[in-house]
UniProtKB/Swiss-Prot annotation:
Enzyme Commission number(s) of this protein: 1.-.-.-
Oxidoreductase as UniProt keyword: yes
Source superkingdom: Bacteria
Description of how the protein assembles with itself and partners: Homodimer.
Any single GO BP term: vitamin B6 metabolic process
Enzyme class: oxidoreductase
Any GO MF annotation of the entry: FMN binding
Family membership noted in the UniProt record: Belongs to the F420H(2)-dependent biliverdin reductase family.
Gene3D superfamilies: Electron Transport, Fmn-binding Protein, Chain A
Protein name per its UniProtKB record: F420H(2)-dependent reductase Rv1155
Residues that hold coenzyme F420-(gamma-Glu)n according to the record: Q32, Q37, S50, A56, K57, T58, R59, N60, W77, S78, Y79, H138
Native organism: Mycobacterium tuberculosis (strain ATCC 25618 / H37Rv)
InterPro entries per record: F420-binding_dom_put (IPR019920), F420H2_bilvrd_red/Heme_oxyg (IPR052019), Pyridox_Oxase_N (IPR011576), Split_barrel_FMN-bd (IPR012349)
């Protein structure tokens, strides 16, 4: 598959932050918006987010995997939106399963090392955490300096 070419200024907005607004599609077609913390991998052009199985955004994505993430720049006016088709892991079911391992990698990418990985692993299972991976298929927005 050929690598997509996106505006570097818009990718810089996504890369320069770790908090955005995830938009999913409700059963009636209206958007459902959630503030999320994310990790952007610029080499693979994908965004990853930890979400929980019983939540609306997860149900929405299992029904319709189309999603967008809005990221604001520091100036308050500039922004980038990344769109794609979400891929979801199964919910974490055991402290040593593949989903928990993927969530640990995400945590490390966002925050570094955790003070108690055993506690973290159990929390991922208790919360029924899921890894959302959003390969970016389209980016649009208003880069800094364009207003």
């Amino acid at each position: 598959m050929a690598r997509q070419v996106f505006d570097d200024k818009l990718l810089a907005v996504i890369s320069g932050n770790s908090i955005g607004v995830l938009a999913t599609i409700k059963h009636d077609g209206r958007p459902q918006l959630s503030n999320v913390q994310y990790h952007f991998d610029p080499r693979k052009l994908l965004i990853q987010v930890s979400i929980a199985e019983p939540r609306a955004k997860t149900r929405n994505l299992r029904r319709d995997p189309r999603a967008s993430i809005l990221v604001d720049a520091d100036d308050g006016w500039s922004y980038a939106v990344a769109e794609g088709t979400a891929q979801l892991t199964p919910p974490a079911a055991a402290p040593d399963d593949d989903t928990v391992e993927a969530l640990i990698a995400l945590y490390r990418n966002i925050a570094g090392e955790h003070s108690d990985w055993d506690d973290y692993r159990q929390a991922m299972v208790t919360d029924r955490r899921v890894l959302l991976t959003l390969p970016i298929s389209h980016v649009y927005g208003l880069p800094p300096g364009m207003r």
